Swiss-Prot record:
An example Gene Ontology CC term for this record: NatB complex
Name listed for the protein in its UniProt record: Phagocyte signaling-impaired protein
Family: Belongs to the MDM20/NAA25 family.
Function: Non-catalytic subunit of the NatB complex which catalyzes acetylation of the N-terminal methionine residues of proteins beginning with Met-Asp or Met-Glu. Has 2 roles in the larval immune response: required both for the phagocytic degradation of internalized bacteria and for the induction of Defensin in the fat body. Within the phagocytic blood cells, has a role in detection of infection and activation of the humoral immune response.
Pfam families: NatB_MDM20 (PF09797)
TPR repeat positions: 77-110
Subcellular locations according to the entry: Lysosome
Amino acid sequence: MQQLQLHDVWEKLRPRDESIELGHYKKALQDVEKVLKKNPTIQCGRALKAWAFLRLGRDEESAALIKALEQETPTESTTLHVMTLCYKETDQLDKICQIFTSASKQLPGNEELLSQLFIAHMRVNDFKAQQTVAMQLYKLKPRNPFYFWAVTSVMLQALRGPDAKDQQKSSLLLSLAQRMVDKLIADNKIEASQEVQLYLQILQHQEKYQEMLTFLDGPVCTNLYPGAPHSIKIDLLKKLNKWADLNKLMKQLLTEDPDRWDYYQDYILSTIEMIKCKDETPETDHTVDMCHEFIAGIIESQPRKNRGPYLARLELARLMVKHKFDKEQQFGELTELLLDYFRMFGDKTCCANDLKLFLEYVEPAKRPGFAAQLMQECRINPVTLPSSKEHMQRHICSLQIARFCGAHAALSEEHLSALYTALSLHYEHGYNTFGQGLLPTDMGPSDPYALLAVNIMYDRAWKLQRSEPLVEALCLLNHLLSNSINNFHGKLLNLQLYHRLGLVEAAHRAYESLDIKHIQLDSLGYLHCSHLCNGGFPALAKQIFDQTLHFFINDTNSVEFLKTSYNFGSFSKLIEFLDFRDRLSNSLHFTLISVEALLLEMVCFSGTLAQNLAAYRLMRIKPQEDRIKWDEMSDNRDLTIFVHWDPTVEQLREECQKDSFSQEHELLQLRSGLLRLVSSFIELFTKGGDDEYQTAQDLSRHWEELFVTVRAKNRQPACERFLVNLLPSRLHSVLAMPYEAVFRDLASFLLALWKGEKHDQIRSGAERCVKHVNDLFELIAGSIKTYNSSGDLLWNRKKVHDTVNACVEIAALVLFVMTVCFDKYSQAPAPQPTRKTKKKDSEQNNHEPAVVLMTEKNRLQLVVDVLRALKTNLVDCEAVLSSWELPLLSDSLAGALEQMSLGAKSESAVRLKLMDTHLGEIKELKKLLKDKLKLINKSI
């Protein structure tokens, strides 16, 4: 009966998701305690109680129960499972190994416990211990899976263990893993294709490519792994420089599948390499003429047009240009071949992307002429429209290539406006003629016209430095998305435009429409999350941060993928899963959002100080520890999500992406430094030990050094010349705002205040803090005043938006720290001023005066001075925020939109989003300031 009751309690405690209400845990705890009253020695019940305590934030009580259970060395599976959950939540994975080691010693020969012990070692990447346990299991039950657990563990020691960087030890371990498998091969005990794949992997890591090739063609691989991908053999032949064999293989594969673009690339590569080494092996195509003849033969023999061989012909021409073959050897101008390709496949949506692959090898001076030829091929002029969907697609392709060749960059503002008008009308015609009756998931065939038009309008706005073209672009996008509700390219441009204008709530709606989930939260979250920080909408930011962190926290259970791989013998996937787990756990985006979420929580603290400190404790911040692996940060951003047709060099784009990652890395350093510095202040004034003082002092010094280092690199914001580009990093906003000075002087004041020795330094520190507070709110008022007097409010909104929100964040963090200081000194007894005395003989000899500490009352008064400055400015700030004018759309703009047939519907939708975002931001900021006022009023 008791076991049944415990099972019921277990089900009640088990979290269905991370957002389970706190009250459920209280009820579960009550149920557990009822059972324990009847039988207080039940280990499972005490484990459940410890877990409930943990979820309720009562960590110390939970730790005491778990420690008592550890000493009893439990062996019952449910108890061990609950203890495992507790250790996972407190990030004590090594303790899981300890309890299962103790349990397996109590019950030697227990397969389940040994298997769980193996998995426990797997969680902490203790590959040596994995090997030991796997061999114990194999001796207990001689099965191939257990043996290959051991083989895999040896391989992982070589690749990812402590000795992985020692070339000699790593080689020895890989040799051991190979010999272990060789033994089974000799005994004819290999049973599965996954075991064969693991052996190939071991050989590959040793770079024994010839052995791999021999084994791949041998009887074991042929029988157990008949479906081995051709790519394995192709890669081996390339690494072994067996170009003739590769050439023969690729000819055979292309004969069977003549539309494989990747096969053509390897086939042409083999021909070029054979030419270089003058290899004329029979039955190979060892000249460009033979290669061209083979490709031409496939083109002539195919019953229908396939892109593969035509792309191959372009690839051959490209490589001949790259390797500087004589013009006599080349098969015509590359531009002529590209033009032929356009004539053949211009009606395909992929044609423009195909042509982009080769345009880099066309001389820049010839590109505009080539683009003009494409336009002529379309036979569309200002008074004609496409006659069919295919005709329209050819026109779209020619326009995209024209932009890529730089044709639009040279246009004047008037020509850009005319081109925008033409593209918008083409979109309307295409939608009305060819875009009816499509499925909701389909993108309209004329949608690319609208996307190009939006880019054109951004170009125009950039030239004019005005917002009206951007509003027109937003209206067109709104119209596009009402027709093609799932056009994610349009949604991405919408998101970009709203963020560039500092309209966070409108950008959030665009982000939500993308329906980003799962791994996309890491790869695409950068599009929005980073700009939510200090975005003026803390509730929205919390929602997105929680959603993102929920994915990453749950993905710590990706260890289950590894467990499944071991259980099902999918050994070849283990390295892939381990790499994937490392990329997620070291994701720059995840780490930055983790830090930002904690800072946001502090900024939004409201209620009583006791409630705030309780919430702070739940964050489990340890300022003395830097838990970020800075050298292992991973850039998981998907930077290919945008389709761009801007005339940028790919090499420059790659350099910009690397620089962007470096800037985000430095932003993370500054934000993490801020979080740890503020936390060190809280620890100092709540615990008040010498260790806490030393930590705060070290972090204060680190804060100053960080800014010196980052400023010395002189990073430049990402270029905003084109719409489809990375948004400028928030690093520049942090450097421009007074973060450095405010928290440097705050640290100096608080450290001196805690010591209480240098009275003048303490008073001057308090005065500097008061001045910083006044300056912050003057900066808010000044930026809003400048904005209100600017001619184009919407164009200048982003700057004032960043300034206001940064200043509010700084003020909120300072306020939280000062309320903690106030609490410390207001509750302290009022002793007489303490005096550090020295021995009389020492005083007589050195004539040094005694050090008189500042009284608690005087310290409290200085803290109150800072809080009063905050209070005064917070009260005044409400009126300042109310004066922040709403950007209004001009009547001429409405008329222009009407002429474009976009109608009032799109214009009113954009106007409403603009108004809601602006007024909503002011409302959210006022609410935040009111919460801060309430917090101050409860203190002073």
